[in-house]
Amino acid sequence: MKLSKTISALFLSLVLMVGSFGTANAAKRLHAAIADWTGGIITCEVAVAILEREMGYKIKQTVFPSGTGLWEAIAAGELDFACESWPSYAEADDVMFNEDLIYDGKVVKSYKGDGTVDLLGTTGIIGMSDYWIPKYAADELGIKTWRDLNKHKAKFATIETGGKGRLIGCPVAGWNCHDQKRLDLLGIDFQADELGTEAAAIAEAKAAYMRKEPFLLYLWSPHWFFGEFDMVGVQLPDYATCEGDTFTEANNWKTCGTKGWPATGWDKDYTMNYGNPATFAKAEHADAKAFFERMKFENIDPVSYTHLTLPTIR
């Protein structure tokens, strides 16, 4: 699936569903962050397309890596908004949000931070993460869950990993995935390989798949990769609260044994858009704030991107 075709299809379906927006007489301006993974790029490109083509905005876009630095840039007003934050991998949301995260009318979490960043509503995309192997490898080796990986680690080993298996890991350090620590805590004798970008990790996995080699891949859902390649999750253990302790660097990685997934205590990621409070408090941007609050993707299935439903904003 090519990204440009995906964005075009999503934009077309969105416009057909949305109806008409009021267009501003003079262009209003916002500054958006370009995400460093495919899903975030798609979410923001669709938002930017609607804001510009239907609502009269001019949007400046800047490539900005995920992580605490992005949140700080938004709080400082250097950027106005960013799209599709995954709370399992955001360590600044607890510090900077001061409002409820609501999904389907239910409060998922009440944030008690300083309010220096605004939660602009959920995207509708519910994410999850796991480690995945090709179905052909799972069938051949009899791997059912993560507990079976060590028995077959030699099949996943490389010259670089020696006697350990290799995980094509979470690609970007700023995403706070902490794969190696998680592998070690679970007793999985694999070495996490951080390749720097989503594109590099996917290219590595695609090449191994085409060669019909076993490989273990960190990946999140929804993701287009699952629409092209038959993969099986190893069912990493669900998160469980551990006497107030969470699997974070701040408390030296305290854990409940196998119950430390994902990193900050979310069994599902209710993804959200976020922005600068002063920007979206301005009357001239009230329509943009309403747009983000109503913008919703829908997960048709757990592995692929979907259509958008957006109420008309008047």
Label the model's feature ranges.
Residues 39-57, 182-183:
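Short, polar/charged alpha-helical segment
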Residues 71-86, 166-245:
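Ligand-binding pocket segment of bilobal, Venus flytrap-like solute-binding proteins
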Residues 105-167:
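A conserved helix-loop-strand patch within extracytoplasmic ligand-binding domains
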Residues 16-24:
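C-terminal segment of classical bacterial N-terminal signal peptides
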